[in-house]
Structure formats: C-alpha cells, structure tokens
C-alpha cells in the first residue's frame, strides 16, 4: 500500500491515500497512511497534527527531514527504530526553534528561552517542553546513552513524541 500511495501521484490516481484511509478507518484497521507511510496512528486529531507540521516543515529542509525520518523509523514494520524516531521528533522541534530564533547553533533550551519572550509562550509550557527535551537528552536518556539499563523506547513513546513535537511546531507557527 505504501508503494501504491507513493505511486498514486505519478500515475494520477486521484485521492488514493484518502480512499485507502477511509477504508482503513471503516474496517477499524488501526492504521493510517501519512506521507506514504503506514503508521499505527488513527486519531484524526493526531494525524492532522502530524500532517500540519509536515506542511509547515516543507518550507524548512532541516525540520522536514527530521519529521519525515521520525515517521519513517516509526512506520518500519520489519525493524522499527522507536529510539531514533524519538530523537528525530525532538530534533525537528530544535531545528524549528533555531529557525525561529535565527540562531543555527542554539540548543532547544536556549531557543525556548528566547521564544518564550518573542512569541509570548507561557513559562510552564516552555518548562514542559524543556523537560521533554531533558527526557531525551539526559545521561540515561534516549539521545545519548545505549547502556544496558537504558530506557526501553516503545511504540507508544515514539508516537507520543512525534505527535507532541508536531503539535508544538504547529503551536509555534500559530504564535508567529
């Protein structure tokens, strides 16, 4: 189906992905096609958050690359890589925030501090996203450590991060 979804624009099958998604929904399949990838996300709001973020990201290569890679890693049924999907999701936010602050070397924490002032986001919201970044970045976290006692990253973790990071990108875009 992924192949056909990707091919549908080339051979001009109108609304192929939409039709398949309608059938998947009707049959309660538990899957949706997003960006020609079959993923275990079915909530219309969650799908919309990801699709909207991908639309925003299409203007920024780095953000688009991270979001697409996160989706790719999440949707790989033979060898899913949830850990790296989480990394790519938070990296998309970091890339978008560095674009918003016009500081390509800014860490997410530094960029959020500036965005808190310029985009008037609430300090608790800034803190919560900083904490999510910390979850992915601390010594036992997802981005830096591959020790035996590591956190086991699950499908639910990767879905949460992709959806949350997509929603946060959408939120920041709306605040511009």
Listing of model-derived features with the role each one plays in the protein:
Residues 1-65:
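Internal, Lys/Arg-enriched amphipathic helical interaction segments that engage polyanionic partners
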Residues 6, 15, 36, 52, ...:
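Acidic-enriched, low-complexity/disordered segments with a strong bias for Aspartate over Glutamate
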Residues 8-11, 15, 31-35, 78, ...:
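Long, hydrophobic, amphipathic alpha-helical segments used as structural scaffolds
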Residues 40-126:
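Long, positively charged binding patches that form subdomain-scale interaction surfaces
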Residues 108-176:
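Long, charged low-complexity segments
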């Amino acid at each position: 189906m992924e192949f056909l979804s990707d091919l549908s624009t080339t051979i001009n099958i109108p609304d192929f992905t939409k039709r398949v998604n309608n059938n998947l929904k009707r049959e309660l399949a538990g899957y949706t096609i997003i960006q020609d990838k079959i993923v275990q996300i079915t909530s219309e709001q969650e799908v919309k958050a990801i699709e909207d973020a991908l639309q925003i990201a299409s203007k920024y290569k780095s953000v688009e690359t991270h979001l697409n890679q996160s989706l790719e890693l999440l949707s790989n049924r033979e060898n899913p890589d949830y850990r790296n999907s989480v990394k790519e999701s938070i990296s998309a936010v970091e890339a978008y925030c560095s674009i918003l602050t016009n500081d390509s070397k800014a860490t997410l924490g530094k960029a959020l501090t500036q965005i808190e002032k310029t985009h008037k986001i609430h300090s608790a919201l800034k803190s919560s996203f900083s904490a999510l970044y910390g979850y992915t970045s601390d010594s036992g976290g997802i981005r830096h450590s591959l020790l035996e006692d590591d956190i086991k990253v699950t499908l639910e973790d990767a879905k949460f991060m992709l959806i949350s990071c997509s929603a946060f990108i959408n939120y920041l875009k709306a605040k511009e």
